Amino acid sequence: MDKVVRMSSEKGVVIFSKSSCCMSYAVQVLFQDLGVHPTVHEIDKDPECREIEKALMRLGCSTPVPAIFVGGKLIGSTNEVMSLHLSGSLVPLVKPFQANLC
């Protein structure tokens, strides 16, 4: 679990994904559209994939991927991110991590 905690705190927005997961891709595109460049860890390419999945579940993820962290804090999966976005709460949450687009 230490590895997951370390990885989730590396950058402002971190997504744990699998290369074949279309929902992970959709979340990545959403963040990019908001001017955020998330760090994406494709866990299916990691030899410790099973351990990472178990650690994500222990941290409270309802599904192992996508698991989205903002500022080192677990936000959740696609449903939680989309709910935050639709309610207008996602942009203020990621504002500190938006790229300078000037």
Curated annotation (Swiss-Prot):
Coiled coil: none annotated. CDD domains: GRX_GRXh_1_2_like. Disulfide bonds: none annotated. Gene3D superfamilies: Glutaredoxin. [2Fe-2S] cluster binds at C21. The keyword Glycoprotein does not apply. This is Monothiol glutaredoxin-S9. The lineage of its organism: Eukaryota, Viridiplantae, Streptophyta, Embryophyta, Tracheophyta. One of its GO terms (molecular function) is 2 iron, 2 sulfur cluster binding. The gene is GRXS9. GO terms for cellular component: cytoplasm. Belongs to the glutaredoxin family. CC-type subfamily. InterPro entries: GlrX-like_pln_2, Glutaredoxin, Thioredoxin-like_sf. It comes from Arabidopsis thaliana (Mouse-ear cress).
